Amino acid sequence: MEKPSREAFEGNNKLLIGIVLSVITFWLFAQSLVNVVLILEDSFNTDIGTVNIAVSITALFSGMFVVGVGGLADKYGRIKLTNIGIILNILGSLLIIISNIPLLLIIGRLIQGLSAACIMPATLSIIKSYYIGKDRQRALSYWSIGSWGGSGVCSFFGGAVATLLGWRWIFILSIIISLIALFLIKGTPETKSKSISLNKFDIKGLVLLVIMLLSLNILITKGSELGVTSLLFITLLAIAIGSFSLFIVLEKRATNPLIDFKLFKNKAYTGATASNFLLNGVAGTLIVANTFVQRGLGYSLLQAGSLSITYLVMVLIMIRVGEKLLQTLGCKKPMLIGTGVLIVGECLISLTFLPEILYVICCIIGYLFFGLGLGIYATPSTDTAIANAPLEKVGVAAGIYKMASALGGAFGVALSGAVYAIVSNMTNIYTGAMIALWLNAGMAILSFVIILLLVPKQNDTQL
């Protein structure tokens, strides 16, 4: 049978299912380790610090490399990069489950981060190329279900699989899903940019980005232990500022930059990406609230997780609703509505001073609003970012957008945890949780303002 040409090919459900399955290898499977930290500590006979490195390094490496890989997808082929990403996930999963050596666990998790960096921008670019109009919005809705929905379910999923089958089955199932995704994507004609010349990859930009982000991550997670007046803290801060400044200068001069700052001349794209960074940052809410109810109210892990059931359900339901609102109201109104609803939910969850029964009620309602808001926001935001990117740079644009997702989540969790720990030590855990949750509410409010100012009422989308 003759393989369909790119010009004749239209995206179908088979390809879309393959794309969604490839996306959940990160957002559902790789992220589910957040709920099995203690089990990993025993299985690998190592300390909690090593396990925490293994858990966090996947999102960090995904965020650091996703932009560069987005550019490679534009140049060398988006189907090719998606397949490479899926194969990397299989390799990383195998390294994690074949032994009890902590080093292999960390290497496997690192490879899974690179896998996610390949899959996320490449699959968004495939949707941009092969799905048009309402079909594209529908495809983005399912892509969002894989990412936002996967991240919402991952904690329960990881705990359930680890309890019923053993934690290694998380990655055995991930390998099976990866093989199915490869089969479903097979036969799709390649899509790449025709106008981008194959210039030398921006190694300098990548190195500077890695140095900057690693320095910032250490400052946030270890800053209170190091002390703001310590030589190491000051050195890391200087490295972060210096590498960031040099990165900006070199990227503006580069002929083939890692991050094309010209994309940010489009206000709609800038608004979608910046708000996406901040709303992924409010993932710190889950860490702070779950820790608080366990330590402050004496809840078990299962009881704490049950409070957020309304979030998991609503985010999955409302993503398709967000798609319909996008089609009827445009991008801006659903993004504002979603963010506004999320702010209400965040404020309810932050009421840690209430009596236990009242707080539990506020949490359940708050998580409902939290999931409802994120679900409404997800598809319009993704559509705004992708629709406002030039076709020849959609891989880079998608890479930057998903870098904002990964880094927003990574730094949001780190910053929320740091604020919670510092304020709790200075006062008590009730105040510590409230202030940390207010930080998340502040990020959501800033996201609302950015959408209000930057995203136009009617986007001049490039369908």
Swiss-Prot record:
One of its GO terms (cellular component) is plasma membrane. It is a multi-pass membrane protein. Keywords: Antibiotic resistance, Cell membrane, Membrane, Transmembrane, Transmembrane helix, Transport. Coiled coil: none annotated. The keyword Nucleus does not apply. It is found in: Cell membrane. The keyword Membrane applies. InterPro entries: MFS, MFS_dom, MFS_trans_sf. Its main location: membrane. The chain crosses the membrane at residues 19-39, 53-73, 86-106, 107-127, 142-162, 165-185, 201-221, 230-250, 273-293, 299-319, 334-354, 357-377, 403-423, 435-455. One of its GO terms (biological process) is response to antibiotic. CDD domains: MFS_MMR_MDR_like. Multidrug efflux pump that acts independently of NorA and is one of the factors that confers resistance against diverse quinolones and chemical compounds. This is Quinolone resistance protein NorB. It comes from Staphylococcus aureus (strain bovine RF122 / ET3-1). The gene is norB.
